[in-house]
Each structure stands twice: as structure tokens, then as C-alpha cells.
Amino acid sequence: MTRTANEFLTPQAIKVEAVSGTSAKVILEPLERGFGHTLGNALRRILLSSLPGAAVVEVEIEGVEHEYSTLEGLQQDIVELLLNLKGLSIKLFDQNEAYLTLEKQGPGDITAADLRLPHNVEVVNPEHLIGTLSASGSIKMRLKVSQGRGYETSDSRFPEGETRPVGRLQLDASYSPIKRVSYTVENARVEQRTDLDKLVIDLETNGTVDPEEAIRKAATILQQQIAIFVDLQKDQAPVAQEPREEVDPILLRPVDDLELTVRSANCLKAENIYYIGDLVQRTEVELLKTPNLGKKSLTEIKDVLASKGLQLGMRLENWPPASLRMDDRFAYRSR
């Protein structure tokens, strides 16, 4: 195959292989060498950060004033109950927010199926466990669900200095409908050319959006963002940009850079958490199991991460990166 210097191959086919109802592999080929990583990284970042979704942002529980309370007859404490509510997969139709209610008498499990929903709200994981009641237990609560994008801390919803209402428990919201996404670039061949790329995107959603539709939305967002460059005037000087690394540099920094309290920092080091990339992969539940790390320290860690655009429970592909050698870890550990 012969080609001119200005000729670029464009993908001839896109293939979607459904793995389950919520996960799929998307295969795109052939691509010019290097375009697999270019497109794969851009789509992955958009999928994780920019697709709209819904999440529980506020909870009112009868008889409970704050998240550190307990409810008689409820097996879980309120913090664990709130964490379980974050696992609800909710779809809102033609609205930005909605209110759900729940009333239950024990004994038995409280699941998402027990929620009373408005006509324009759907919970796609009705079997999701929220809590467990004993024979003498009962619960009555109201949930506020909002639409959004990315990750939003509860503090960001209140202007500085504004007092939060007592009894209305605020939750950090992860709106993204994407649970997991990664990509690989394999070799592809067209006739005699073997220096081509094949892009394979592997993704899993929370069920509120079809994997194929998620890819379509991400590609549309990318197209809209770069369309302006097509009409770029010739007399406009191009702006040089430094290439971005696969791994965000902030993830390679030691946790000491977060300037946590001595107690929090020592608890993390005791769990072999030396780098910010190590920390963001831990969940709230995992950190609460750390000896001497209480809910106050957890709140401090979450707030510091949020100020840097990070959160707990992130999934990082290929961590630790090759640039973070084992001897670097040993050197840091010996400080």
C-alpha cells in the first residue's frame, strides 16, 4: 500500500462486544501508529469525568441529627448506611433533582426496592442492600437525588460561612455512571502495512447508561470540544502545549505533600500508603478499618483530596507506574 505524507488512515469499522448488560469491549481499527493512545486516553478521561449522572446528595432520617448517630434496631451505624446509599444507581428523566422516601419495619434487609419513587425516577439496582433492621427496628427517611457531572463534595454546595441545616445529612456525590474503564492498544495490519494501531476500550457502567451509549456520548463531547480548531484562522499562531503524561503527576507525590495532621499521616504510613496514588485507590470503608484512623481523620483526608480534584475509591490502571521504582518506595519508607 502506498500513501502520501498528507494521507491518514481512518478507522474502517467499530465493533462492540457485549460482555454483560453493563460492560462491553469497544474495538476501533485501523488507526495510524500513535493514534490508539491519543484517542484512548482522551475518551477514557471523558468517560470518567464528563458524563452526566445522578446521585444521592442529601438524606433525612427520622430520629437522626448527624452522621455519627446510631439508630436503635438498625444493624449498621449511620456512616455505613450513608455509604450504602452512595451505591444506588439512579436515573432521572427530564429533571435535575427528585426526592425519594422509604419507610420500613423490621426484621429484615432494607434494599433499594423499598424506596418509593416518583414516576420520573428509576433505580436500576433494586437488590442493592441499604441496611438491616432487627425485629424491633424501623426506619423512615427521605433522600434528595440530584443530576450532575464528575465529583462534588458536600462542602461545595454551601457558600462559605453558611450553616448546614441540622438533621439533613450531606453526602459527597460521584455522578459518573462509569464504574470502570481502561484501554489497550494492539497491533493492526492492513494489506502490507503492519505499523498500525487497534484500540480496545473495556468499560463497565452502573447500569444507568448502556456501554455503547456511554462511548457515543464521550465521543460527541470530544468532537464538540475540538471542532473549533477546524475553523482556526491561518493568521492565528498555534499555542504550544506540553504533552501530558499518562499518570497525573500529583499521584506520584508523597502523602506528606497533602499536609495532613500528624495522626492521619502516621495512620496512612502504617498501612503502607506512601504516595497520593496509593491513597486515592482506598475506599472510605477500607480507611475506616485502619487502626487509630477515625471519622474526623477520614473527613480531613477527603476534604484535602477534593481540593486537588481527587477522591477516594478511584481506579488507577497500571499502578504503580514504571517511573515509580521499588527502590523509590524503599527510600521513602526509610525517611
From Swiss-Prot:
Residues 247-335 are annotated as: Alpha C-terminal domain (alpha-CTD). GO terms for biological process: DNA-templated transcription. Pfam families: RNA_pol_A_bac, RNA_pol_A_CTD, RNA_pol_L. It catalyses: RNA(n) + a ribonucleoside 5'-triphosphate = RNA(n+1) + diphosphate. GO terms for molecular function: DNA binding; DNA-directed RNA polymerase activity; protein dimerization activity. CDD domains: RNAP_alpha_NTD (cd06928). It is an enzyme of class 2 (transferase). The keyword Transferase applies. Residues 1-233 are annotated as: Alpha N-terminal domain (alpha-NTD). InterPro entries: DNA-dir_RNA_pol_insert (IPR011262), DNA-dir_RNA_pol_RpoA/D/Rpb3 (IPR011263), DNA-dir_RpoA (IPR011773), RBP11-like (IPR036603), RNAP_asu_C (IPR011260), RNApol_insert_sf (IPR036643). It comes from the Bacteria. GO terms for cellular component: cytoplasm; DNA-directed RNA polymerase complex. Its EC number is 2.7.7.6. Keywords: DNA-directed RNA polymerase, Nucleotidyltransferase, Transcription, Transferase. The keyword Zinc does not apply. Belongs to the RNA polymerase alpha chain family. Homodimer. The RNAP catalytic core consists of 2 alpha, 1 beta, 1 beta' and 1 omega subunit. When a sigma factor is associated with the core the holoenzyme is formed, which can initiate transcription. DNA-dependent RNA polymerase catalyzes the transcription of DNA into RNA using the four ribonucleoside triphosphates as substrates. The N-terminal domain is essential for RNAP assembly and basal transcription, whereas the C-terminal domain is involved in interaction with transcriptional regulators and with upstream promoter elements. This is DNA-directed RNA polymerase subunit alpha. It comes from Acinetobacter baylyi (strain ATCC 33305 / BD413 / ADP1).
